[in-house]
Amino acid sequence: VRRDQTSQDLNNLYGLARRARSKLEPSWYLNLAFYGNEQWLAWDGRQLFRPPVPRTKVTLVDNRIQPIIRKEIARMSKMRPVFTVTPNSADQEDTNAAVLGEELMRYLWKHLDMQRHRMNALLWSRICGAGFLKCFWDPSIGPKRTLVLKPDGDLLAAANGRAVNAGSPEHMLADSMAPGSLTTKSVAQGDVRVEVRSPFQMFIDPLCDNFAEAEWLIEESVKSEDYVYQRYGVTVAADTPANPGLVEARMGGAFTLLPGRTAYMGVRLREYWCKPNREHPQGCRQVWVTTTSTKGKVDSQILERDDAPFDPMPYVMFAGIPMPGRLMPMAVVDALRGPQTELNKVESQLAENRNRLGNPTLLMSRQAVQNAEQFAEQIGRVGGIYWYDDVGSPNAKPDVLPAPSLPEYVTDQIPLITQSMQEISGQHEVSSAQVPPGVTAASAINLLMEADDTMIAPDVADHEEELGKLGCKLLELVSHYYTTARTIQI
């Protein structure tokens, strides 16, 4: 039986899930670095680092990965999804409810800024193999009302069952009957909320082969002290540095703060979600915070527990390239990093050879050139003149040492690497509105475009299926929590 009753039990589950995915994290960090134009990095087992190279060495970056990812996201999200709600029966009431559901989804798509969340989740799935959307009810957002509380702390209700607003006739009447016994409280209306989660924040059941089979998961995030106090009513000391960026946070000494400066700190918040099981017939949700003292002692405190959450698994996952027998898919960047590294090396070698031709090595006689510093200064000027002594030796005159030319097979590597990256990504010339050499027939061009689109078809199908699941979750939340009249714009 899985133990999840105490904060220590939850921390143990967190450790198990973290160790299960530890071998994938280095690849995620490298993928992010390559996408962000940091492509001369390596992983030393703990963090990213730049291998030491001479200052004169050219480290050119010709980032072909970023446009590939952006094109793939554009191909998958160029059309706004259309949600279709099917009525349960042919009754007019069910038909009207289905029409209302479709109108409501159009409203929620704009109201919740779903396009931006969708793009961010897709970006994570293309770079790291998985991106998540979390759909839940947030009682702290929306317009606020001042309600009346009875002496026992419950809301004062009117005859129709609705809560009484402060200052209303019902409030005045109840207060006159029991002067001074009533209090008021500001309560938000609440609303549906959608947030993006990266694979770095998700610690999923290690026994599952796909996300739908996950029995539990833990989400980790860093929040401000005020956020924790507003949501859970407790004050927790911040001890976790704010994240400057996932790649930058793993760069070690290159991004260390200067002496005398302190980082902006936050609170490490963890959230446990569990599907129904023997211990939790209706599922379970727990929120706890983990702090570390100055002596290195780790303390944990459970802030909230819900033994009957409305949705015990409020996440959908956008997947990359499926890997048999593994929960986390791989990303196309994993396969592109090798060719991208070789492309950078070849182009850096060409740049170094170009620099040698523009600033060649000179041969000069020590007897003919009396002042070496003055000679070096003159040859660096345009049209500079330097007088040398003709000592009668054939080697007295300074001469240029010709730089060796690169073999043809080095320059031939660039088109080969480019073709390899096109095959890996499924983005050939036709995907970039370019006609391949020798192809003139319209039917042939259409076949090539169809071949590129076919390669991405499984990803598009998975994306549409997950969007459908998200739509169902949104409508279920609205049906359960929209208990008061609201105005929506269609």
What are these regions (language model features)?
Residues 98, 114, 126, 336-339, ...:
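Active-site-proximal structural scaffolding
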Residues 257, 263-266, 270-438:
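Extended, charged amphipathic alpha-helical segments
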Residues 127-131, 386-387, 434-450:
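Core structural elements
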Residues 1-305, 358, 374, 402, ...:
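Extended, helix-rich architectural segments
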Residues 37, 42-48, 152, 364-380, ...:
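Charge-rich, acidic-biased intrinsically disordered regions
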Residues 83-88, 116-124, 135-138, 353-366, ...:
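Short coil/turn segments at secondary-structure boundaries
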Residues 108, 112-116, 135-141, 206, ...:
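A generic secondary-structure signal for well-formed alpha-helical elements
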Residues 139, 408, 443-490:
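Extended amphipathic alpha-helical segments with heptad-repeat/coiled-coil character used for oligomerization
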